């Protein structure tokens, strides 16, 4: 917000239509390619409200439709009309917060069942969106608190209550997005713990197999040596049977020992 002698210049960052369309899909998922925010600049004077934006915006369309239905409200001044724009801008966060909440619930459900790489990528993308939304909400909150507390002469005292109402909504949304950020961090830590636990289970199985096979490999290596004076070479076919039975006994004893120690 920047104040001049006869005007007030304000910049806010509403959500883009493209992002809202992606968020509004039935499955509440998108690929993260949609740009979340755009820029809306406004100049307020005593009798004039000028807005500048780079693409069509829902809040401007809603204001235009409102004035077509209630033309007399336009006489209340630019500060009242600008409050309507900000109110529509803040209300657009509702479906986004619902999308984030649904996405976090989905991730929390599946992260322990099947911690796949695709879930990890989606978590990172969602966390980036939450951080970006949080930064924008904090910025918008600072703008609105200045408009709501009577810092500028161009905002009439009777309109401040409307700005305070929009500010209260924005504060509530900021608290919700902060809670979502903490929840996303917890889910990410849960995913990493589940992945680590899964890796430990795999290593446990591989280590168990290696431990069982190790004495068998040792026996095969000993009896595979070509020394003429080895006693077992004189046993003929029984020497072969003895080696197999010894290997099997080592494997059974190893498995029994693991069960006794409750390692399996």
Which residues are covered by each model-predicted region?
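Hydrophobic alpha-helical transmembrane segments and their immediately adjacent juxtamembrane loops
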Residues: 168-264
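Peripheral, non-transmembrane regulatory/ligand-interaction domains of membrane transport proteins
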Residues: 1-158, 162-165, 169-176, 234, ...
